[in-house]
Amino acid sequence: FIIIGEIKNAYEQILKRDKIKPIDTVRLNQLNGEKSNLENNLKDIEQVKFTMKNSLNQCIQRNYNQLSSLPAYKNYQTQFNDSEMILQLVPEGQLFPLENVGSKSNYMFMHLCFYLGLHEHMINVGQIHVPQFLFIDQPSIPYYTGTSNEKIGNDDKTKLLDAFSLLNSFISYITTEKKDSFQIFMVEHAPKEYWTENNLTNFYTVDEFINGKGLIPSDIYNE
């Protein structure tokens, strides 16, 4: 009797269930279409990311190719690693980037190339959300230790002039070839003769903080 009771109860539960509804083919096709669109959008996003990354690397490379102070890394390819957010150099004919590029001077040049390339890329794609200017604080840091009346060697002077020339040529490229605008604000320890005597026409000295004159006027903190 127990077994019969269990069977009867199970049968009654089956009868109480909702009847199986036929498949709504129209709705099914609609959902399948939405799924396909989402999958295609994902592919499009990945393609856009790939294209934008290549464009960024090309802009960085254009600036890097103008340098003459990295002879050991001539013909290397610049590659922005978006997973680690760093710029790397890939030797010609190789697949993997260098782990280290040596001196502070080399990293300073890579720093300049990245940010100039980034702004160039954003100008190329017509973005409007990032202002077209850079603030650069003392690119001469690798060559000056901070002592007063300090002089640097000829090799370091050549490298620093190379960095200034890169900034100057970038402004010319954006304003002349791209027909756009850009501005660089630079606070620098090196003397102004670097640009006044080397035809860096896009440089303009706003003020000099020498002989006791500072960014904050002395009469403010002497009161």
Placement of each model-derived feature along the sequence:
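Extended, charged coiled-coil "arm/hinge" scaffolds of SMC/Rad50-like chromosome-maintenance ATPases
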Residues: 1-94, 125-131, 219
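Flexible loop/turn segments at secondary-structure boundaries
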Residues: 45, 52, 96, 141-145, ...
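Conserved ABC ATPase signature
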Residues: 87-115
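Conserved catalytic network of the ASCE P-loop NTPase/AAA+ motor domain
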Residues: 102, 125-128, 173-179
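Metal-dependent nuclease catalytic cores in nucleic-acid-processing enzymes
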Residues: 113-124
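Walker B catalytic acidic pair
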Residues: 137-139
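C-terminal lobe/lid and adjacent interdomain/linker elements of RecA-like ASCE P-loop ATPase modules
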Residues: 149-223
